[in-house]
């Protein structure tokens, strides 16, 4: 079982009972803006949480998707953050994160993503970690830059949903960059 504590957060394994908290924030229109679906239902969220729980038992484990909780609020679930090992031979993985819009602007997503970078480089021994974000999501792009990740690609009109084409950015960091200038 993986549990990561930061200055303000606890990133912990999902449990099946987490789905109502996930549904609450994934139903917010601000959250839904950059996702292909226009609404979330209980079944889809239960499937997501069950998928996260099932990854905990895999061997070797390649997906470390953790619930972001805030001890100061009694352990309220604020979002999700994870690192996935994409290619063990090349020691490559990616990170992703999402946060309840009620908690945006407090640095929680940055703190959680930094913890997952640290876990990926220092515990999993990854060489390269990348992240993808919607190019219109300037807050997410800024977060990745604040972590010290470099923009490596701009994919133009690579996704189509909600009646339009969307661009994506790819950011990445290498293990020697992490060691040379640890972010946090």
Give residue spans per PLM region:
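Conserved catalytic-core motifs of GNAT/GCN5-like acyltransferases
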Residues: 14, 85-86, 130-132, 150-166
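Positions that flank functional sites
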Residues: 41, 136, 159
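Conserved acetyl-CoA-binding loop-helix of GNAT-fold acetyltransferases
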Residues: 97, 105-122, 138-146
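GNAT-family acyltransferases
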Residues: 1-102, 119, 123, 164-184
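Proline- and acidic/polar-enriched loop/turn elements at helix boundaries
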Residues: 38, 65, 115, 132-133, ...
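A generic structured-segment signal
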Residues: 80, 94, 109-117, 155, ...
């Amino acid at each position: 079982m993986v549990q990561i504590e930061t200055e303000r957060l606890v990133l912990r394994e999902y449990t099946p009972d987490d789905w109502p908290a996930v549904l609450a924030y994934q139903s917010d229109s601000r959250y839904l803006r950059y996702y292909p679906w226009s609404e979330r239902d209980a079944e889809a969220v239960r499937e997501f949480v069950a998928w996260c729980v099932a990854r905990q038992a895999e061997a070797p484990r390649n997906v470390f998707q953790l619930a972001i909780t805030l001890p100061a609020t009694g352990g309220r679930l604020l979002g999700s953050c994870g690192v996935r090992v994409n290619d063990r031979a090349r020691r490559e993985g990616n990170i992703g994160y999402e946060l309840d819009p009620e908690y945006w602007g407090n640095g929680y997503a940055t703190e959680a993503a930094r913890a997952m970078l640290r876990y990926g480089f220092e515990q999993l021994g990854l060489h390269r970690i990348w992240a993808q974000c919607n190019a219109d999501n300037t807050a997410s792009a800024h977060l990745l830059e604040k972590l010290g990740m470099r923009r490596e690609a701009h994919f133009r009109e690579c996704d189509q949903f909600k009646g339009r084409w969307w661009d994506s950015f790819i950011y990445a960091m290498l293990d020697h960059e992490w060691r040379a200038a640890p972010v946090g």
